[in-house]
From Swiss-Prot:
Annotated InterPro entries: Kinase-like_dom_sf
Family affiliation: Belongs to the choline/ethanolamine kinase family.
GO cellular component: cytoplasm
Organism, as annotated: Caenorhabditis elegans
Top-level taxon in the UniProt lineage: Eukaryota
pH-linked activity: Optimum pH is 10.
Name of the protein described by the UniProt record: Choline kinase B2
Protein biosynthesis in keyword set: no
UniProt keyword Lipoprotein present: no
Length: 369
């Protein structure tokens, strides 16, 4: 834990030390009226919902510019990526303005908005809007590595799990009822799964490499109060990746509810995993928006939508393996985010092995073309 994270987590938001600190940050990065603000005029309120950041809404009773303060919990490499991405999107009007960054945190524009939850992303019209916004981000050229960071992260997490003393991992699902999985997996087994899926993906979908969010859970989608426009936030995993991985990541997360107020703090819905209700309209919206953005006319829109659905289905299990490996490592680190990470890891591994045969079938079909 960094010194500034410790400072903001151990002290009350209305403590004198915190009030003076946010005034200092306001003066340093925003200037203007913040130079004349007294601590009695400041309000700091915690914003709930962030798993990788501590967030605070800082306002005053004066005309000083309000701001959102993020105190990071992620590794420096992810913080760097997220900040670069935010700066790029900010300049293009695709997200909140970046006011400033410092060691351990950053300040950005506070957007009056509604944060989506899992119920919101399952509303068909919202799913259509989300599908339509993806091509806009996928078309952006971002000056970061074009390598598929998701695969590197999976290997890093697995190596971290092993270095922390992790070994064979028993798969005992809690919130899903799948049984078509091995009883346990070894580190060697998991490395093989990563290698094998990377091989399949590279062979049949390498041409789909785009800049991706890679973590579009419902809480990373804002609906602006003023226009009802959607804005995607929290880009710490934003890198180039296979398009289908990015889309499948969002669709996969619509089947998972983190609002469970008691252990294990997570519920995976098998019905939504096996029969995602909005995948058709989501992919239709993507194809239509992509067509308009690129000013093109697909010769067979129906076939294009069908192919995109297949692309999402192919990557769906990999998104669960991705987060399973993260949860395995962070469980050993005693990372706390309100979710039993071992339950999440076991359930996601069960989902991975349940859906993997479909991906293999898609690979075998497309590799013959």
């Amino acid at each position: 834990m960094t010194a500034i994270e410790k400072f903001f987590t151990e002290k009350s938001p209305d403590s004198e030390q915190v009030l003076l600190k946010v005034i200092e940050l306001g003066i340093d990065f925003l200037g203007g009226e913040w130079k004349n603000v007294d601590k009695s005029q400041v309000n700091v309120s915690r914003v709930h919902g962030g798993q990788s950041n501590h967030m605070f809404h800082v306002t005053s009773s004066t005309s000083a510019t309000p701001y959102l303060l993020r105190i990071h919990r992620q590794p420096p490499s992810q913080v760097f990526t997220d900040t670069v991405n935010l700066a790029i999107f900010s300049e293009r009007g695709l997200g909140p303005k970046l006011y400033g960054f410092f060691e351990g945190g950053r300040m950005e524009e506070f957007l009056p908005s509604k944060t989506f939850d899992v119920n919101d992303v399952l509303v068909p019209e919202n799913s259509r809007k989300i599908g339509a916004i993806f091509p806009l981000y996928h078309s952006i050229n971002v000056p970061v590595s074009k390598s598929r960071r998701c695969v590197h992260l999976m290997r890093e997490w697995l190596n971290g799990y092993e270095s922390l003393g992790g070994g064979d991992y028993e798969i005992l699902p809690t919130t899903v009822n799948y049984s078509d999985h091995p009883k346990s997996v070894s580190i060697k087994d998991l490395n093989h799964e990563i290698d094998n899926f990377e091989k399949w993906s590279t062979e049949i979908f390498e041409h789909t490499l785009v800049f991706s969010h890679n973590d579009l859970a419902s809480t990373n989608i804002l609906e602006l109060n003023s226009t009802k426009e959607l804005v995607l936030i929290d880009w710490e995993f934003g890198t180039y990746n296979w398009r289908g991985f990015d889309l499948a990541m969002h669709l996969s997360e619509t089947a998972i509810d983190y609002r469970v107020p008691f252990p294990p703090g997570i519920k995976m819905n098998g019905d939504l995993i096996d029969n995602p209700p909005n995948i058709q309209i989501f992919c239709e919206a993507y194809v239509e928006a992509d067509k308009k953005l690129k000013n093109r006319s697909p010769s067979d829109p129906t076939a294009e939508v069908k192919a995109l659905i297949q692309e999402c289905q192919f990557f769906w299990p990999l998104t669960n393996l991705f987060w399973a490996l993260s949860a395995m490592k962070h469980s050993l680190l005693k990372f706390e985010n309100g979710v039993d990470l071992d339950v999440q890891a076991r359930d996601r591994l069960a989902v991975y092995f349940h859906l993997k045969p479909r991906s293999q079938k898609i690979y075998e079909e497309l590799s013959k073309k």
